């Protein structure tokens, strides 16, 4: 089976969030099920620089405001997977963030940039590459939301059955919304600008295009698949998603064991397994404390946070509850960037308590590994969370997740309640209500369990034994493909 994945990010070449981890890990995981995957990405500088030995597949005349368009074919570095790169310098050759300028303002022509990506995917689905034609095109998030629309438009124009399409929602909150006036520049049939198409409350929605026109829809956890059919988390699309519930699947993301594996992670102070976690994690904690300037205290409970600093991630709760950690002798290590007010609030907390709170603004993949290995608890107090990868990394590294019971967090972490401790299923700490009080109680329970060393080690062992690799997810995705082909 031949499948084309369409996305805007791919780890380790370009990453702004978990999307990149998923698009990198899924194609090789699908290979074990006989799926021949290829990937299509925009020609952002990161891709153009990292991908070598590119072969020119075709030159396309000016389109979507791009003066020059070249489609290259190459291998993803250090893999056997083929990748198509859409090189359109006037649209993609911009420094920094792939979606926004240096002031963090979204590029005004993002609709053209990602329309081109979707349009090229449709051309590949029709045989643009004479040597390889996909049977399924799988697009990821709003950046690739127009892919099913362009493929459906081609089917309507030609009268020929098009390839099948799958669209994955990684985060429904980011919808790719643009003024209605841009539709005229998208080269789509006029009938697509309607309630049964791209129109969304007087705007054009790339996310809605994917949800409406794809043959199958997946999202990244079973709980999130249910939540997005409700008013609270449907972001205005709950009606469409409820109508399409028979085509909607929640498939939990996995962890790539080649990247996240405490037994062989070269980025951490000491490697360890389930049986050697006590010694290994102690070494990683000491190294983390030294690196971040925290007080060297073996018995301090270290809470790690690796996240975007946004209200969605529950950081407004954490800034209010952080005193609960430090007053009990705990320490906090935070890595992330985002909302300026939150950045300043955490920096101020670190300045006030430099031996208890360490904050690094920005994203550093190596430091993320060190924080997750060296912490005792990984905090993920998100208001909503489609899947979440950080808690899965925490489980893998024996760093107990403390999470809000929502989305994929609810599906992957089992609370250390008395009954769960008794039957050996506990893997972390879960709080139900999105409030400072509920988060604070969960923090107190983490301290209480840490003081019962035997129980802590038991929960850590259970956490590290959880199956969180990509095999189960790839199996389910392959089953969805098989329904279509």
UniProtKB/Swiss-Prot annotation:
Any one Gene Ontology biological process term? glycogen biosynthetic process
Q: What is its EC number?
A: 2.4.1.21
Supply the alphabetized keyword list: Glycogen biosynthesis, Glycosyltransferase, Transferase
Q: Where does ADP-alpha-D-glucose bind?
A: 15
- GO MF annotation list: alpha-1,4-glucan glucosyltransferase (ADP-glucose donor) activity; alpha-1,4-glucan glucosyltransferase (UDP-glucose donor) activity
What superkingdom does the record give?
A: Bacteria
Q: Name one GO cellular component term.
A: cytosol
Entry function: Synthesizes alpha-1,4-glucan chains using ADP-glucose.
Among PANTHER family, the record links this protein to: ALPHA AMYLASE DOMAIN-CONTAINING PROTEIN, GRANULE-BOUND STARCH SYNTHASE 1, CHLOROPLASTIC/AMYLOPLASTIC
Protein name stated in the entry: Glycogen synthase
Q: Which organism is it from?
A: Francisella philomiragia subsp. philomiragia (strain ATCC 25017 / CCUG 19701 / FSC 153 / O#319-036)
């Amino acid at each position: 089976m031949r499948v084309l994945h369409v996305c805007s990010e791919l780890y380790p070449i370009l990453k702004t969030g978990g999307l990149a981890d998923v698009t990198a890990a899924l194609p090789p995981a699908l290979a074990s099920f006989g799926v021949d995957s290829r990937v299509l990405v925009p020609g952002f500088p990161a891709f153009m620089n990292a991908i070598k030995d590119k072969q020119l597949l075709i030159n396309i005349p000016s389109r979507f405001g791009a003066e020059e368009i070249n489609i290259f074919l190459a291998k993803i570095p250090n893999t056997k997977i083929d990748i198509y790169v859409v090189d359109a310098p006037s649209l993609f050759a911009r420094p920094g963030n792939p979606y926004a300028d240096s002031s963090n303002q979204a590029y005004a022509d993002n609709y053209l940039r990602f329309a081109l990506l979707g349009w090229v995917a449709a051309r590949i689905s029709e045989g643009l590459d004479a040597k390889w034609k996909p049977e399924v095109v799988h697009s990821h998030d709003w950046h690739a939301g127009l892919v099913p629309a362009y493929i459906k438009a081609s089917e309507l124009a030609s009268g020929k059955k098009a390839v099948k399409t799958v669209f994955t929602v990684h985060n429904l909150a980011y919808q790719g919304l643009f003024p209605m006036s841009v539709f005229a520049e998208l080269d789509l049939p006029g009938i697509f600008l309607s309630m049964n198409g791209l129109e969304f409350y007087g705007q054009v929605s790339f996310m809605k295009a994917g949800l409406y026109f794809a043959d199958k829809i997946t999202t990244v956890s079973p709980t999130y698949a249910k939540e997005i059919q409700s008013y609270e988390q449907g972001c205005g699309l709950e009606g469409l998603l409820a109508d399409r519930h028979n085509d909607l699947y929640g498939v939990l993301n996995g962890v790539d064991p080649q990247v996240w594996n405490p037994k062989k992670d070269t980025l951490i102070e000491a490697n360890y397994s389930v049986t050697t976690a006590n010694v290994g994690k102690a070494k990683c904690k000491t190294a983390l404390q030294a690196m971040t300037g925290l007080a060297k205290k073996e018995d301090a409970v270290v809470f790690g946070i690796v996240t975007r600093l946004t209200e969605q991630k529950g950081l407004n709760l954490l800034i209010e509850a952080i005193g609960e950690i430090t007053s009990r002798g705990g320490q906090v290590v935070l890595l992330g960037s985002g909302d300026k007010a939150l950045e300043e609030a955490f920096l101020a907390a670190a300045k006030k308590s430099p031996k208890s709170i360490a904050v690094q603004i920005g994203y550093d993949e190596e430091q993320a590994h060190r924080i997750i290995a060296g912490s005792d608890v990984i905090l993920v107090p998100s208001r909503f969370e489609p899947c979440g990868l950080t808690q899965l990394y925490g489980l893998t590294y024996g760093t107990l997740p403390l999470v809000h019971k929502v989305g994929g967090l609810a599906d992957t972490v089992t609370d250390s309640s008395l009954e769960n401790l008794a039957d050996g299923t506990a893997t972390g700490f879960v709080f139900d209500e999105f409030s400072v009080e509920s988060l604070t109680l969960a923090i107190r329970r983490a301290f209480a369990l840490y003081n019962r060393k035997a129980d802590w080690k038991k929960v850590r062992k259970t956490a590290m034994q959880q199956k969180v690799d990509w095999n189960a997810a790839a199996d389910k995705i392959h089953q969805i493909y098989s329904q279509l082909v």
